[in-house]
Each structure stands twice: as C-alpha cells, then as structure tokens.
C-alpha cells in the first residue's frame, strides 16, 4: 500500500514537473517573440521618422504633406484601437499579435514599393529631361547671346516631361503603407502586456516588461544606425553609375536609399510574426485540455435553451456596459485634475513630436549637417541619454515614493528644462546663407528685401539663364549662386573632381584681388562660428534629452493616481487617443506648414507645379520653429502650477479619496509605467 502511494506521488510529481516545464517553455517563447516584435516595431517607427525628409524630396512634396504622411500611422492605429481593446482579450492573443506583426511588415514593404515603379530620381529636373543622365556634362554655363539647349523654358519641360512623371502621386502608397503599419502595430503592446500580466509568476511582471522595453530600446539604436548607413547611399544605388552623380549627402537635393530601411524593417516584422502562430492561447493548459474545453464549449452552445439564455444575458450585459461606459467617461471628463493633465501632456508631447519629426531638416538647414551624421549622433548619444533618463526617473519615483504633488513638481522641472533649452536655441540660430538671387542681388553687392523675383544683374542678364534652376555653386567670394549660369560662369573643368567653373562674371564684380573669378559645384559651407554653434546645440540636445526623460516618467504614474482605480484603463485609453489624434496626427502637419512658410526656393516639377523646398531662410526657420515650441511649452508650466494648486487644495479639504490610495497603487503605477513608457520614448529620443 505504501509502495502504491509512493508510486502515485511520484507520478503526480512527474506530471506536475512536466506541466511546469511546459508552462515555462511556452511563456519563455512568448517573451522572446514579444521582445523581437518590439525590436521590429521600434525599427519601423524610427525608420519612418528619419526618412520623412528624404521622402519629401523623392516625391517632390511640401513639408506639410510629408507631415500628413507621417501622421498616417496614428490614423491607422486609431481605426482599430477600439476593436483591439475590446475583442483582443477575448481572442487568441498570440495569433492576433502575429497578425499585427504581419500587417506591420506588409505596410513597411508597401511603403518602399514606389521606389521600384517611379524610375530614376532626377535631382535636377529643370535642366535634365532624361532621368538616366545626371552627369556633369549637363551643367549650364553662361553663353552670351546664345540659347543653351539645356536651358529650356518651363513650357518645354512640361511638354516633354509631364507625362513621364505620371507617378508623382505615388506618395499615396507611402501614406497607405504607413497607415497599414499603424493598424498592424496596434495589438502588440496592449495584448502583449496583458498576456505577460496574466501568465507571469506573481511579482515578476515588472521584470519581464522591463526586459521587453530594453529590447525595444536596442531596436531604436539599431534603427538610427541603419538610417545613418542608408542615408549615405544614393537612392538609386545599384541602378545608376554612381560616378556620374554630382551631388553629395550634404546637398539639399540628396536622397538616400530610404526604401532600403523600409524593406529591412518589413522583413524583420514579418519574421517576428512567425513564432506567435505556434504559441498557445493559454500556456498553463496542454493542447489536449484545450481541445476538450473547446469540445465541451461547442456542445453547450448547441443547446437551444442555453443560446436563448445567453442571448438575453448578452443584451443585458451590453446595455449595462454601454451605460457604464458613458458614466465612466463622464466621470473622468468632469475630473478637473484629469482634464488639466490631458491638456498639459498634449502640449508638452507636441513639442517632442515636432522635434523628432523635423530635427534632421532643422540641423541640415541650420548647420549643414548631413542626415547620415545626424542619425548617427542621435543613435549613439541622444537615445542612450533618453533611456538612462527614463530609468533614472523611475528610480527617483520609487526611491523617494513621490506623492501626487511630488510627481507634478518633477514634471514641472522637466517642462522648465525643456523651455530653457528652446530659449537657448534662439542664440544658436545661424544667419541665413548669402545666396545671390535670394538674400543678395545677383552681383552680390546688396541685400534684397524679398527673395521673390529678384531682378537679374548686368553680370548675367545676357546669359539666357533659366531662373527656376537649382544647381548651386559656391563662388570664391563665399556667396552661393543658384546655378553656374546665374553666376555668369563661361567654362568648367568638365567631369573632373572637384568640378570648378571659371570666368564667372558675377564673382568678378566683387573685385577679388587674385583675379580668380571661379566657383565650385555645391553650396558654400557654413562659417566656423556656425559650426561651433552646432556642437553647442547638440550638447544641449543630449542634456535636454536626459533631464526631460527623467521628468516625463512621472506622466505615466500621474494618469493612474488622479483617477479612481476602476477608471484607470479608460483614463489611459482616452489619454492615448488624444495624444495620437491631436498630437501624432496634427503636430507634423501644422509644424510642416510653418516650416514651408520659411522656404526661399522651391523646386519646379516636370508639370510646372511647386515641388519640394531647396533652401530655407535659416534665421526665420529657427525663430518660427523654436518660437512655436516655446508657445506650446509655456502654458504647460502654467497648467502644472494650477494642477499643483488644485492637488494641495484637495489634500487639505474633505475630498481626499484620490490621494488616500497613493501608497497602495505604487507597484501598479510602476507596472503601468513600463507599459506606457514606449509611448513617451519616441517623442523624446532626440531631445
């Protein structure tokens, strides 16, 4: 008898061990798959952000339209967020995440497809009708009393080239691909977090969530490194002879291999989807048990009485839920602390979203840095500063057990640092370049009041130049000219590197003592003073990134503490919806429209319509961009002051229900911080 009991115990122990091993292995596989999907998610998101300027140039569109394309991700996300939030927990979560990753990858690949159907990139459309010929032999010189065949009028360009550019609306595919990526990314975070929270060992959820978010951070670094590499590559690499390409990555017309980034991220996303289709709905149950449960469920649902009862109960349940939803929504919208919180976080995050979207354009126009260099420094310096700042902020909150007032003060410090950094940037704005025909007269002797319709000078009036051309050359006098023809250059060194133009009459007007009236291809570089400002600018960016990330961690905890526990999920969801709709969608559009107002020279596409901007007034651009950011951040300080005042007033009054449970929700708040941290990271990683 004893031996029989011993054998039974041994068998039960072995069975228990097998179940634990099966559960552990299934959960570990899910954790590994989710970590990989976080890497894919981060890769796709950052590739889009750092490619937006290149997309703008490739498709010859304005910054505001490029901002709309960037915001299409949030549009896609909003289309399905309600469906995923409601039905996600009732369906097979791993498979739903796998479908999301598959859609995310498909969207990224769709985004890259226009590259293969648009033909070769023509960076000099005004002077070059054949898209396969970007060689230096097509550069226009000044031929007095003669009309160059290459200097065609706009009507000739339209007649011969407009039909060839029938793919000018291919940006719509980029829009749709980015929207599809937004749809696909929706289930990854909420369903992944809930799965971990349901099946992780008690007390281990925070550790697992931290691990997943760290993997997401590595994806961000990887994305910036890839972006830096692809930005160096010419867009048509592998299709054209690169020795004939006369522009460099510092040229405002340069377009890197933007499509490669989307191809890579798309493939990675599709690969990341595969493991989820082989994971169980519940890692605690073996396959046989799940099949039996499913069979019993089918038998029950075949019972007509049960169906009628279930239908009646379901109607009551839905009615109760709808009524409860609107009551809950009314409750959070009549909570003054929550309303103030939503407004100031929207304003604060809008500033970060604008910076992330347009930082490459800003640095390029202000300091002449290439996109490749900017991406590299962001990935190596700014992004780690954000990561360290966020973990430091979480540590400070937990170590000092900050109250609601303490969290608000931490957020106030973050906003103050960000505001001061924007004010400092005003002193780091470089003067606009000296460009004949835009900021100076063509002879280079006098500034102009407006860059519109600057009259020709006697040094180039007989050259029969096309004033719409943008083929900049830098004269020995330090002035940039719109083209060799408008500089009055009579000859060139041909295809030899570097390309030099000689006998430039507009350069001669300045009266150089060495009589070397020449110009070389490309815009004139920034002076040493501006270069020094660029280094100071980036140091402030990194410090701002760290200090602001420390404060931004308080937002994830604040949203939990200011509402009742049962309204937490709704409060977070509504806040996320506002951030996406009014922040993620609108901010790139209205900041892009503001940037467009500072453009001095627009390209003209083959149909005679306005294309992408070639050069901005860097002074006006800096003032407008940083000025709008200051206008967004200053009200944040005012609202945070009001927030702190209201909290203190409540803490001394009778209504202390919101504050009573602060200590009890600390662990839960830290868990939610790990859940929501990726929502704040992309908006701050360049700061």
Curated annotation (Swiss-Prot):
Expressed in the perivenular areas (centrilobular) of the liver (at protein level). Signal peptide: none annotated. Residues 51-63, 118-170, 228-258, 361-376, 431-539, 590-624 are extracellular. One of its GO terms (molecular function) is bile acid transmembrane transporter activity. Transport activity is induced by farnesoid X receptor (FXR) agonists such as chenodeoxycholate. Its main location: endoplasmic reticulum. InterPro entries: Kazal_dom (IPR002350), Kazal_dom_sf (IPR036058), MFS_dom (IPR020846), MFS_trans_sf (IPR036259), OATP (IPR004156). It catalyses: 17beta-estradiol 17-O-(beta-D-glucuronate)(out) = 17beta-estradiol 17-O-(beta-D-glucuronate)(in); dehydroepiandrosterone 3-sulfate(out) = dehydroepiandrosterone 3-sulfate(in); taurocholate(out) = taurocholate(in); lithocholate(out) = lithocholate(in). It comes from the Eukaryota. GO terms for cellular component: basolateral plasma membrane; smooth endoplasmic reticulum membrane. One of its GO terms (biological process) is sodium-independent organic anion transport. It holds the Pfam family Kazal_2. It is found in: Smooth endoplasmic reticulum membrane; Cell membrane; Endoplasmic reticulum membrane. Keywords: Cell membrane, Disulfide bond, Endoplasmic reticulum, Glycoprotein, Lipid transport, Membrane, Protease inhibitor, Serine protease inhibitor, Transmembrane, Transmembrane helix, Transport. SUPFAM superfamilies: Kazal-type serine protease inhibitors, MFS general substrate transporter. Disulfide bonds join 459-489, 465-485, 474-506. Based on a naturally occurring readthrough transcript which produces an SLCO1B3-SLCO1B7 fusion protein where the first five exons originate from SLCO1B3, while SLCO1B7 provides the remaining exons. The resulting mRNA encodes for a functional transporter SLCO1B3-SLCO1B7. Mediates the Na(+)-independent uptake of organic anions. Transports the conjugated steroids 17-beta-glucuronosyl estradiol (17beta-estradiol 17-O-(beta-D-glucuronate) or E2G) and dehydroepiandrosterone 3-sulfate (DHEAS) at the smooth endoplasmic reticulum membrane (SER), granting access to metabolizing enzymes. Contributes to the metabolism of bile acids such as taurocholate (cholyltaurine) and lithocholate, by functioning as a doorway between SER and cytosol, thereby decreasing their circulating levels and protecting the organism from their detergent properties. This is SLCO1B3-SLCO1B7 readthrough transcript protein. It comes from Homo sapiens. The gene is SLCO1B3-SLCO1B7.
């Amino acid at each position: 008898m004893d031996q029989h009991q011993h054998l039974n115990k041994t068998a039960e122990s072995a069975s228990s061990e097998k179940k634990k091993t099966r559960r552990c292995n299934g959960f570990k596989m899910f954790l590994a798959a989710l970590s990989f999907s976080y890497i894919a998610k981060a890769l796709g998101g950052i590739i889009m952000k750092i490619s937006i300027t290149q997309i703008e140039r490739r498709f010859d569109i304005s910054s505001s339209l490029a901002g709309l394309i960037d915001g299409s991700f949030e549009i896609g996300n909003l289309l399905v967020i309600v469906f995923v939030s409601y039905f996600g927990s009732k369906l097979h979560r791993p498979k739903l995440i796998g479908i999301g990753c598959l859609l995310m990858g498909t969207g990224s690949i769709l985004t890259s497809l226009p590259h293969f159907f648009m033909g070769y990139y023509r960076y000099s459309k005004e002077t070059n009708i054949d898209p396969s010929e970007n060689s230096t032999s097509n550069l226009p010189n000044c031929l007095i009393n003669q009309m160059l065949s290459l200097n065609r009028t706009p009507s000739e360009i339209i007649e011969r080239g407009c039909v060839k550019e029938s793919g000018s609306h291919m940006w719509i595919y980029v829009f749709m691909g980015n929207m599809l990526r937004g749809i696909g990314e929706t289930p990854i975070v909420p369903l992944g977090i809930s799965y971990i929270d349901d099946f992780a060992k008690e007390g281990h959820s925070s550790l697992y969530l931290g691990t997943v978010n760290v993997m997401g951070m590595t994806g961000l670094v990887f994305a910036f490194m890839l972006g830096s590499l692809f930005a160096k590559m010419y867009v048509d690499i592998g299709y054209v002879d690169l020795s004939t390409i006369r522009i460099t990555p510092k040229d405002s017309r340069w377009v890197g291999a933007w499509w490669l980034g989307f191809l890579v991220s798309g493939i990675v996303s599709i690969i990341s989807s595969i493991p989820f289709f082989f994971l169980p709905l519940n890692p605690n149950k073996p396959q046989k048990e799940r099949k039996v449960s499913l069979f019993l469920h089918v038998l029950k649902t075949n019972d007509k009485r049960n169906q009628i009862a279930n239908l009646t109960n379901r109607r009551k349940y839905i009615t109760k839920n709808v009524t409860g939803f609107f009551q809950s929504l009314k409750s959070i919208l009549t909570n003054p602390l929550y309303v103030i919180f939503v407004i100031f976080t929207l304003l604060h995050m809008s500033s970060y979203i604008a910076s992330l979207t347009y930082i490459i354009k800003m640095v390029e126009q202000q300091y002449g840095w290439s996109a490749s260099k900017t991406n590299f420094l962001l990935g190596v310096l700014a992004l780690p500063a954000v990561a360290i700042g966020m973990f430091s902020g979480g540590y400070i909150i937990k170590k000092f057990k900050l109250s609601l007032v303490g969290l608000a003060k931490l957020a106030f410090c973050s906003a103050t640092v960000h505001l001061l950094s924007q004010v400092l940037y005003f002193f780091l704005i470089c003067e606009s370049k000296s460009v004949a025909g835009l900021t100076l007269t063509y002879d280079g002797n006098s500034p102009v009041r407006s860059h519109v319709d600057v009259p020709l000078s006697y040094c180039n009036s007989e050259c029969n130049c096309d004033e719409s051309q943008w083929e900049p050359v830098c004269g020995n006098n330090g002035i940039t000219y719109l083209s060799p023809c408008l500089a009055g250059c009579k000859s060139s060194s041909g295809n030899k590197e570097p390309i030099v133009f000689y006998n430039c009459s507009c350069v001669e007007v300045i009266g150089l003592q060495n009589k070397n009236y020449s110009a070389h291809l490309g815009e004139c570089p920034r002076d040493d003073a501006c270069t020094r400002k660029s280094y100071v600018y980036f140091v402030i960016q990194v410090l701002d990134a760290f200090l602001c990330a420390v404060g931004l961690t308080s937002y994830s905890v604040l949203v939990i503490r200011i509402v009742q526990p049962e309204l937490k999920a709704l409060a977070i969801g509504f806040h996320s919806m506002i951030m996406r709709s009014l922040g993620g969608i609108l901010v790139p559009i209205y900041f892009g429209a503001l940037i467009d107002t500072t453009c001095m020279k627009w390209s003209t596409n083959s149909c005679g319509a306005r294309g992408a901007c070639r050069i901005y007034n860097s002074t006006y651009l800096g003032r407008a961009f940083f000025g709008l950011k200051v206008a967004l951040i200053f009200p944040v300080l005012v609202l945070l002051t009001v927030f702190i005042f209201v909290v203190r007033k409540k803490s001394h009054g009778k209504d202390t229900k919101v504050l009573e449970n602060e200590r009890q929700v600390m662990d839960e708040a830290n868990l939610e911080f790990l859940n929501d941290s990726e929502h704040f990271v992309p908006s701050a990683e360049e700061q």
